[in-house]
C-alpha cells in the first residue's frame, strides 16, 4: 500500500511539473473574460494505470478489463476457473449452479483496476489526472484527447486557450470527493491563475451530478457566474435504475429469442447465433443467471463508487438503497447516497438559490423524442429495459433530467389536442414535450431526436459557447439563430469527408474541372454546416453528396494507395466509404441464411423459451 501511494504521488508530481508553466501562461489571460471549466461526462476523462516503477501500462476512458493474464495470481485463476466450471455444469444439468459470489470473484479479477481498498484508494496504481492548468498547458497527448472529446475551437478562438479548463474524474469514483475536488480546482487552480473571481461551469452528461453536489456542499461559495448544462444528468436516468435493479422490459424475450435482436444493433448472423445460444438453458435459468450477474456487478463496481449511484433517479433511489445499501458495511456509502438523492430532489430550489443570491445564470441544452437505446445504435441494449418505451429521452437520459422540470409523453407520441390547445402549455412542434413546466424555460433549448453524443452537433455546441461568450441570454434573443426547438445533427461523417478533401487538395493532382467541382462541394457543405436551423434531410443529402464526389475522385486518380498514404502521412483516403460496394462473402451469406433459418425454425418450435423448457413441458 505504501509503495502504491508513493507511485501515485510521483505520478501526480510529474503531472504538475510538466504543467508548472501554467501560471506564466495564464498571465496573458484576458481580464474581461470569465474562465470556462468543463466537467465532462462518462467516457470523456482518461484514466491511466502505472506499474510499480511509474511506467504507464494501460489507459482507458470507461471500463477496463484486465486481460493481462500473466498478472493473474493463483487465486485469480481459481476464481476464473470456478466461473467457467460453473457455467459448464449449468449447461450440463440445465440449472443455474453459478453462485453470485462466484460471479463476483470473477468480476474482481476482470475489473481489478476499478476496485478500491478499505481506505478508498484504488487497489492498483490508477490515476485520472486533473491538470493544474488551462488546456494551453496540456501536453500533446492530453490536448489531443481533450480536442477529440470536447470540440470547442470556436470558444478557444474567442476567449483564448488560457481561459479554458477541464475538471476530470473517473466514472468509478466518489460523488462527494468529486464535488470537493471541483471546489479545490476552482479555488486553487482556476481563480488564482486567471485572476477572476468567477467561473463558468459547463457540465456534460454525468458531469451535472458533480456540479449539483458541488452546489449542495458549497451553496454559498458564490463562484459560479453561469452554468451551461449540455445533456446533463441532473436527476439521473431511469435506464440506469433499470439496469441496477434488473428491471427488464416485458418484450425483452422477443429480443433474445427472435430476429428482433437486430434492433439492438447486432448483425443478422450474430443475432441468429444469440437466438440459438440463448435456448441452451431454460428461460428461468437464464433469468436467474442474468440477475446474479447484474447483482454481482452492482455490488462489485457500483456500490463502492457513489458517482454511479448518483445516476439513479430520486424516485427509484429508495428501491436501490433497500436492495444494495443495507448493513453496517454500507453505512457511510448510504449516508452519502441518501444525501445526494435529497440533493437531486431539491435541484430546483438549489439552482434558484444560486440564481437569486449570486445572480448565477442557468442554461440547459438537451435532446429529446427518443426511447432509451433508440438513436445512434451505440446504446441498443437499453431496449432490454423496462422504461425504454415509456420515456422521452436522448436515448440515455430522459428529458426531465437533462432539461429539469420538462413534462413529456413517450417518444414518438403526442399530448392530446385538448392539452396542446391549452394556452398555458407550451408544447413542442412534434407534440411530445411541454416546456411550460421546465424550471428555467426561457433558457432551455431542445433538439428533436438528438442522441446523447452531442459532439457532432456543431449548433448545439456553438449555442453553449455563444452563451459562455455573452452572445445569447435567453430563447428570446436568438429565435432565428438558435430556435428553442431545433433538430438532430451528426456531422461525424461529413467532417471526415471534408478533412479528406483538404488532403486531396494538398496532392495537387486534380484537373481544373475536378478541382472546381470538389471546391464547390466543400463550400456547399460548409454552408450547410453553418446553417443554425437544422434540416436533417439536407444534412444527409449533403453528406452523401460529399461522399459520392470523394469516392469518384479517389477512384479516378487512384488515391487509395500505400504510396499516397505515405506521401500525405494520412490514411483517410483509404476509407471503405470510398470503395465500391463489394459482393458479400459467399460463406458469410450462406452462414447467415442457414443460421437465420435455424433460428426461425427454433422460434416456431420452442417459442420464447429454452430447449429445457420444451422437454420439461413434454415430460
What are these regions (language model features)?
Residues 487-578:
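Beta-rich interaction/scaffold domains
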Residues 177, 181-184, 210-213, 493-496, ...:
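Extracytoplasmic/secreted proteins, especially bacterial periplasmic and envelope-associated proteins
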Amino acid at each position: 500500500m505504501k509503495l502504491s501511494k508513493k507511485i501515485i504521488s510521483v505520478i501526480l508530481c510529474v503531472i504538475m511539473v510538466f504543467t508548472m508553466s501554467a501560471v506564466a501562461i495564464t498571465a496573458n489571460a484576458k481580464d474581461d473574460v470569465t474562465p470556462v471549466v468543463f466537467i465532462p461526462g462518462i467516457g470523456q476523462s482518461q484514466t491511466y494505470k502505472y506499474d510499480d516503477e511509474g511506467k504507464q501500462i494501460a489507459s482507458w476512458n470507461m471500463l477496463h478489463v484486465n486481460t493481462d493474464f500473466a498478472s493473474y495470481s493463483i487465486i485469480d485463476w481459481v476464481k476464473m476457473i470456478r466461473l467457467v466450471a460453473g457455467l459448464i455444469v449449468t449447461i450440463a444439468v440445465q440449472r443455474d449452479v453459478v453462485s453470485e459470489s462466484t460471479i463476483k470473484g470473477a468480476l474482481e479479477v476482470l475489473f481489478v483496476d476499478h476496485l478500491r481498498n478499505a481506505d478508498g484508494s484504488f487497489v492498483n496504481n490508477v490515476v485520472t489526472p486533473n491538470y493544474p492548468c488551462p488546456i494551453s498547458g496540456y501536453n500533446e497527448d492530453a490536448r489531443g484527447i481533450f480536442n477529440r472529446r470536447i470540440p470547442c475551437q470556436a470558444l478557444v478562438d474567442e476567449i483564448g486557450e488560457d481561459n479554458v479548463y477541464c475538471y476530470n474524474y473517473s466514472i468509478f469514483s466518489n460523488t462527494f470527493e468529486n464535488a470537493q475536488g471541483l471546489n479545490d480546482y476552482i479555488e486553487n487552480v482556476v481563480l488564482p491563475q486567471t485572476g477572476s473571481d468567477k467561473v463558468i461551469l459547463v457540465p456534460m452528461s454525468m458531469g451535472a451530478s458533480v456540479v449539483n453536489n458541488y452546489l449542495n456542499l458549497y451553496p454559498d461559495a458564490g463562484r459560479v457566474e453561469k452554468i451551461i448544462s449540455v445533456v446533463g444528468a441532473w436527476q439521473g436516468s431511469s435506464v440506469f435504475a433499470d439496469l441496477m435493479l434488473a428491471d427488464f422490459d416485458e418484450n425483452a424475450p422477443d429480443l433474445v429469442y427472435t430476429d428482433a435482436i437486430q434492433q439492438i444493433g447486432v448483425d443478422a448472423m450474430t443475432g441468429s447465433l444469440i437466438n440459438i445460444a440463448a435456448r441452451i438453458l431454460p428461460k428461468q435459468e437464464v433469468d436467474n443467471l442474468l440477475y446474479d450477474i447484474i447483482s454481482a456487478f452492482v455490488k462489485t463496481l457500483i456500490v463502492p463508487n457513489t458517482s454511479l449511484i448518483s445516476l439513479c433517479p430520486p424516485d427509484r433511489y429508495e428501491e436501490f438503497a433497500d436492495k444494495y445499501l443495507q448493513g453496517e458495511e454500507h453505512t457511510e456509502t448510504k449516508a452519502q447516497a441518501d444525501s445526494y438523492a435529497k440533493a437531486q430532489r431539491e435541484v430546483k430550489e438549489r439552482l434558484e438559490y444560486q440564481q437569486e443570491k449570486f445572480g448565477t445564470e442557468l442554461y440547459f441544452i438537451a435532446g429529446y423524442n427518443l426511447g432509451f437505446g433508440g438513436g445512434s445504435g451505440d446504446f441498443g441494449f437499453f431496449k432490454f429495459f423496462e422504461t425504454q418505451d415509456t420515456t422521452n429521452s436522448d436515448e440515455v437520459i430522459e428529458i426531465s433530467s437533462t432539461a429539469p422540470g420538462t413534462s413529456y409523453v413517450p417518444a414518438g407520441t403526442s399530448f392530446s389536442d385538448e392539452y396542446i390547445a391549452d394556452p398555458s402549455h407550451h408544447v413542442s412542434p412534434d407534440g411530445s414535450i411541454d416546456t411550460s413546466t421546465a424550471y428555467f424555460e426561457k433558457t432551455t433549448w431542445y433538439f428533436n431526436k438528438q442522441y446523447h453524443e452531442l459532439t457532432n452537433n456543431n449548433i448545439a455546441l456553438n449555442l453553449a459557447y455563444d452563451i459562455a461568450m455573452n452572445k445569447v441570454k435567453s430563447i428570446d434573443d436568438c429565435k432565428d439563430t438558435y430556435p428553442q426547438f431545433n433538430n438532430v445533427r451528426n456531422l461525424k461523417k461529413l467532417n471526415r469527408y471534408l478533412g479528406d478533401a483538404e488532403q486531396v487538395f494538398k496532392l495537387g493532382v486534380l484537373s481544373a474541372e475536378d478541382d472546381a467541382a470538389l471546391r464547390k462541394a466543400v463550400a456547399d457543405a460548409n454552408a450547410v454546416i453553418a446553417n443554425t436551423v437544422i434540416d436533417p434531410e439536407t444534412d444527409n443529402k449533403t453528406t452523401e453528396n460529399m461522399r459520392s464526389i470523394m469516392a469518384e475522385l479517389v477512384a479516378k486518380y487512384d488515391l487509395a494507395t500505400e504510396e499516397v498514404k505515405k506521401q500525405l502521412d494520412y490514411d483517410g483516403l483509404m476509407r471503405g466509404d470510398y470503395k465500391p460496394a463489394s459482393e458479400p462473402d459467399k460463406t458469410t451469406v450462406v452462414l447467415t441464411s442457414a443460421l437465420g433459418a435455424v433460428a426461425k425454425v427454433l422460434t416456431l418450435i420452442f417459442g420464447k423459451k429454452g430447449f429445457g423448457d420444451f422437454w420439461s413441458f413434454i415430460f
